[in-house]
A protein has these predicted regions:
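Short amphipathic alpha-helical interface segments
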Residues: 27-63
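Short, Lys/Arg-enriched N-terminal segment that forms or immediately precedes the first helix
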Residues: 9-28, 119-127
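Interdomain/boundary linker segments immediately adjacent to catalytic/signaling cores
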Residues: 43, 54, 63-142
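Non-catalytic C-terminal interaction segments of nucleic acid-processing enzymes
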Residues: 2, 14, 19-26, 34, ...
Length: 289
């Protein structure tokens, strides 16, 4: 049962069934390690469970010289959840599966009472603010990490403010990922397969103002080979004449294929069917590979 804290009461909390319990009881329930875990989570805005475990371990090692096992920290996280202070959810980006955590309303109030400070904005909150959803945010994060590991681009941005580009006629385009190599820019759209066709068409058409190479990354084969492939082909059929004049090419891929240097589907405006499993030739500006 989740606790409902009274922010004006420094000693007691109220349960949903009106049974009173002290904040001190919750402190005892979660123990010293639980207190440290929720403090690190709140202060550093960490949302991924593995990152939180590593951060708590580092903080304790630095401050006390003691080693704490990952399993012990996992148990403290479970204690925070069972006491209604955090919630968890599994995320699957197509290249990794992991748990994310966030403070409940009760958890926020508990942090405020115990540590007398407002928690930092969590990674989850940042993704909700910046992107369509938490899941979309983590997909973008993992695509960015893959591109960083390729060491091809000089700069990679996923910030909406930085990626805002005016394209004329009072319109703007905000690519999910903007990569720069020398004087060239490359744009990646990361799709969950939730856009309506009209919105998908508009986004892709805006990108053709910026580039003739449209790159779209999806979570898995089901989404890419089903929803996104159908949407890409519908858009191409509708805009073929304009796309043909611009010599547009479309690269549609799963995140795992991108990691493995492969486009799942490649479209040009000269053939009726896409090429499949096309090797990606990563090149820096000036042809340095």
């Amino acid at each position: 049962m989740a606790y409902k804290f009274d922010p004006n009461d420094q000693t007691t909390n109220v349960l949903e069934d009106k049974v009173f319990i002290s904040v001190e009881t919750i402190r005892k329930n979660i123990g010293d390690l639980g207190m440290k875990t929720i403090q690190v989570m709140a202060y550093e805005g960490i949302s991924e469970e593995k990152e939180l475990i590593r951060a708590v371990s580092d903080v304790i090692l630095f401050s006390t010289g003691q080693l704490v096992s990952d399993d012990s920290i996992r148990r403290s996280i479970q204690s925070l959840r069972s006491n209604g202070l955090i919630e968890t959810k599994e995320i699957n980006t197509g290249v990794r599966r992991f748990n994310i955590l966030w403070l409940t309303t009760n958890g926020l109030l508990f942090v405020g009472k115990n540590f007398r400070r407002r928690p930092a904005e969590s990674e989850c909150e940042g993704f909700i603010r910046e992107h369509a959803s938490v899941h979309h945010g983590y997909l973008i994060k993992d695509v960015k990490k893959i591109l960083e590991d390729k060491k091809i681009y000089d700069e990679i941005s996923t910030e909406r403010k930085e990626n805002f580009i005016r394209i004329g006629d009072g319109k703007a385009c905000i690519p999910d990922i903007v990569c720069k190599s020398g004087d060239e820019s490359f744009y990646y759209e990361v799709e969950c397969g939730t856009h309506k066709q009209r919105d998908f068409n508009e986004k892709c058409s805006k990108l053709t103002v910026l580039t003739r190479e449209i790159i779209i990354v999806g979570q898995n084969r089901k989404i890419v080979g089903g929803i996104l492939k159908r949407q890409v082909e519908t858009w191409i059929d509708k805009e073929w004449e304009a796309l043909n004049k611009k010599d547009v090419e479309v690269y549609l891929t799963t995140i795992s294929d991108l990691k493995n240097d492969k486009w799942t589907y490649c479209y040009d405006m000269y053939t009726s069917e896409p090429r499949c499993n096309c090797p990606i030739v990563w090149e820096k500006k000036g042809g340095e590979s």
